[in-house]
Swiss-Prot record:
The keyword Transmembrane helix does not apply. Residues 1-21 are annotated as: Disordered. GO terms for biological process: translation. The keyword Manganese does not apply. Keywords: Ribonucleoprotein, Ribosomal protein. Belongs to the bacterial ribosomal protein bL28 family. This is Large ribosomal subunit protein bL28. InterPro entries: Bacterial_rp_bL28 (IPR050096), Ribosomal_bL28 (IPR026569), Ribosomal_bL28/bL31-like_sf (IPR034704), Ribosomal_bL28_bact-type (IPR001383), Ribosomal_bL28_sf (IPR037147). One of its GO terms (molecular function) is structural constituent of ribosome. GO terms for cellular component: ribonucleoprotein complex; ribosome.
Length: 65
């Protein structure tokens, strides 16, 4: 399974590590994915992986089951 948010499709970010000696190495920041249960349109609940930012938004709009 890809490390992506299943609702917003937010994926990892890429950048550089910079050491004290100014050496550059590539690195990846993964999204903080958390499992949660969401109500679908037909009233059923589905378990999905969402980022913590999306989880906050779902809690704000009462979309969690």
């Amino acid at each position: 399974m890809a490390k992506k948010d299943q609702l917003t499709l937010r994926g990892p970010l890429y950048g550089n590590n910079r050491s004290h000696s100014k050496t550059i190495t590539r690195r990846k920041w993964n999204v903080n994915l958390q499992p949660c249960k969401v109500k679908t349109a037909d009233g059923k609940t589905t378990r999905i992986l969402v980022s913590t930012r999306t989880l906050r938004t779902l809690k704000k709009h009462n979309r969690l089951s």
